[in-house]
């Protein structure tokens, strides 16, 4: 076990490997911990045999965190070969340099897409021959790269120690926010966003809004709490009677207090922010993502937009992921399935044309404007090159 990176048993195989009964969520976690105690670096348990679950919930556990991947149960037919197929798909996605979280998300989606493609046809054939689907075993067929948004699982993230059972899962703030009756955040006023400047002071807001820019983000990095509050207040006042949609980075409580249009949060921020308070205040919400797993984490929230990055290497901030590239960006846009998208990270004049061709609604830029010799000319050149003019 200690020679492999990940073990992928189903429920029955987990029970056999650990010599423990697995009959509910508590015993499932106990068995996973037993297997990790035997040397497994990480464990991914497929939930298809977990009779106690409402949905099919696969679980991934490693030293630092736990992820759950949930899909609706498929009632018709018994599809054989999906476990081997998932493990093979997982290995293939890892070889293609996807991080483990994204590789698992894609492997789960791949099997789901195979199931949704295979079973209806084979069940129809069985019905035509008056064969009961409950008594029939079908065999999985290979498929291409998963592309249908409905094939992808809901992904939930948990730190170690916060994964024990269904009740514990309900305490997850993101699940609470996405299960709210009014789960949609307010829509953007303009979805054809164009160039999206991300700036660090109200002075930049004042310089740029006369260009007719449709969206900007104020990301204040330094200053006292009072100075930050004043900058946010002034920025909101500056654009209040314009068409510019101003998002405040991180400071969601000040954004609510001062009546901002919207707030932008990173992955770490959504763990601690009161998302229902943001929604109740009528603020729009943009969220940063860095791959398939994080997109699937936030899609259920129906945010006002999803930021996709970082596309190219960037020195603007330390990033938790590798550059994604334009090919992956195009897949991310398709996965967001109607939720407005913003590309971000290392985008400049020479790269912006290829980024725009992916179909993103907006393209966020930082140094391409703020470090330009003539920022307003740089903004206009970016608009022109991207085809947003």
Model-found features: residue ranges?
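Conserved phosphate/ATP/ADP-binding segment of small-molecule kinases
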Residues: 1-66, 234-304
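Hydrophobic faces of well-ordered beta-strands that scaffold small-molecule active sites
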Residues: 7, 191-199, 216-218, 246-248, ...
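Short, small-residue alpha-helix embedded
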Residues: 15-16, 76-100
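Short, well-structured alpha-helical segments that form the helix of a local strand-helix-strand
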Residues: 28-36, 99-115, 380
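Charged C-terminal helix
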Residues: 102-188
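Catalytic domains of carbohydrate-active enzymes, especially glycoside hydrolases
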Residues: 207-219
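Glycine-rich phosphate-binding active-site loops on the catalytic face of alpha/beta enzymes
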Residues: 220, 267-275, 307-320, 352, ...
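Catalytic cores of alpha/beta
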Residues: 246-261, 290-302, 335-337, 342, ...
């Amino acid at each position: 076990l200690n020679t492999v990176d990940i073990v992928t048993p189903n429920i029955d195989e987990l029970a056999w490997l650990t010599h423990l009964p697995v009959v509910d969520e508590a015993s499932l976690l106990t068995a996973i911990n037993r297997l990790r105690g035997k040397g497994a670096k990480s464990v991914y348990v497929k939930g298809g045999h977990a009779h106690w679950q409402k949905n099919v919930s696969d679980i991934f556990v490693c030293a630092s965190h736990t992820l759950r991947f949930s899909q609706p149960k498929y009632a018709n037919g018994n599809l054989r070969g999906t476990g081997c197929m998932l493990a093979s798909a997982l290995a293939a996605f890892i070889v293609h340099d996807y991080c483990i979280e994204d590789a698992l998300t894609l492997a789960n989606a791949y099997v789901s897409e195979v199931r949704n493609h295979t079973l209806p046809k084979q069940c129809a054939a069985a019905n035509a021959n008056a064969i009961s689907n409950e008594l029939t075993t079908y065999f999985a067929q290979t498929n291409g790269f998963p592309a249908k948004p409905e094939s992808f699982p809901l992904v939930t993230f948990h730190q170690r120690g916060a994964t024990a059972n269904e009740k514990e899962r309900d305490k997850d703030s993101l699940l609470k926010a996405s299960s709210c009756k009014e789960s949609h955040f307010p829509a953007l006023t303009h979805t054809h966003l164009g160039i999206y400047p991300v700036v660090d002071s109200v002075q930049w807001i004042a310089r740029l809004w006369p260009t007719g820019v449709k969206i900007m983000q104020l990301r204040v990095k330094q200053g006292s709490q009072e100075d930050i509050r004043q900058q946010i207040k002034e920025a909101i006042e500056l654009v209040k009677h314009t068409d510019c949609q101003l998002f405040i980075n991180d400071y969601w409580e000040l954004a609510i207090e001062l009546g901002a249009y919207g707030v932008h949060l990173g992955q770490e921020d959504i763990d601690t922010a009161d998302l229902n308070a943001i929604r109740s205040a009528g603020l729009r919400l943009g969220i940063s993502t860095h791959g398939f797993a994080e997109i699937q984490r936030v899609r259920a929230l129906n945010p006002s937009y999803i930021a996709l990055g970082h596309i190219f290497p960037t020195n603007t901030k330390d990033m938790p992921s590798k550059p994604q590239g334009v090919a992956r960006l195009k897949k991310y846009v398709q996965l967001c399935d109607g939720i407005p998208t913003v590309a971000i990270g290392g985008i400049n004049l020479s790269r912006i044309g290829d980024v725009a061709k992916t179909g993103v609604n907006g393209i966020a830029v930082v140094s391409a404007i703020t470090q330009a010799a003539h920022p307003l000319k740089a903004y206009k050149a970016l608009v022109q090159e991207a085809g947003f003019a």
